[in-house]
């Protein structure tokens, strides 16, 4: 199925005008959505539990309330808290304060699609999911453009849910550069698969395996780090800018020939079958239940995984090498660090 890119000209209804908007959470995405919407003239308040984020929201000039009070005051509520706490937050503080005709928004379909959150039939449920971290959503907005976004409607109680989703996307700047309509199911399952099989899980496992092959063969860990991890950004940037074609035009003929010859030897049909198994676990809800159950148990699996990852040789070698490269990491990520 193909989808058509939409832009500001396609947002024909100012569905958020006259609405009081509550952004729940003031982290990476929360601060960006709230500030961008305020800058486009909308009435935005923040709902967040007492702590650093509460103080930061007030410092940034927002009316800031506990979550329940913000939900009570709002017509449109966007939940931008971490996935694992959303269900409790919704059930305890938001659901009791919902009214018929309200709209409830998300930037990721996880809790709605897997039914950890169940919304009354008289409330709109929509999604606006910018395809970038919050600091980028904010920075690009300030520069006059934005980050592309997905939008979706799960429940249209008022007949206005799609207009709300699109106007939200316009308000955060995404309609300046492009919107794609999707569903909660599609966004959730594709997003999780991308993270697990390719972007995060697949990529880190590939780099770790390459590092181990080289060091186990007697090559210096420092050189192995450069070859399988440090240079990854250079290649990914080329692909990001112009696809596989630009990357292959930019590398040596030797590298390009090796790409064609050896890539399929590494990513075999069996690897593809393994990816299908990952997708099946996502589609069935197994991954979602494992993740939520681990959180409810105090995160024993997550903490064990983190501890194991911290002790990998590739991490230790990389930490030492980066000390000699002050230019690495010297960028505009301050906002990301502040809000997380």
UniProtKB/Swiss-Prot annotation:
Q: Where is the signal peptide?
A: none
Q: Which PROSITE patterns match?
A: KARI_C, KARI_N
EC assignment: the record states 1.1.1.86
Residues that hold Mg(2+) 2 according to the record: 191, 227, 231
One GO BP on record is: L-valine biosynthetic process
Which keywords accompany this UniProt record? Answer: Amino-acid biosynthesis, Branched-chain amino acid biosynthesis, Magnesium, Metal-binding, NADP, Oxidoreductase
Q: What class of enzyme is it?
A: oxidoreductase
Active-site positions on this chain: 108
Q: Which GO terms describe its cellular component?
A: cytosol
What domain of life does the native source organism fall in?
Bacteria
Q: What is the protein name stated in its UniProt record?
A: Ketol-acid reductoisomerase (NADP(+))
Source organism per UniProt:
Streptococcus suis (strain 05ZYH33)
What is this organism's lineage? Bacteria, Bacillati, Bacillota, Bacilli, Lactobacillales
Q: Which gene produces this protein?
A: ilvC
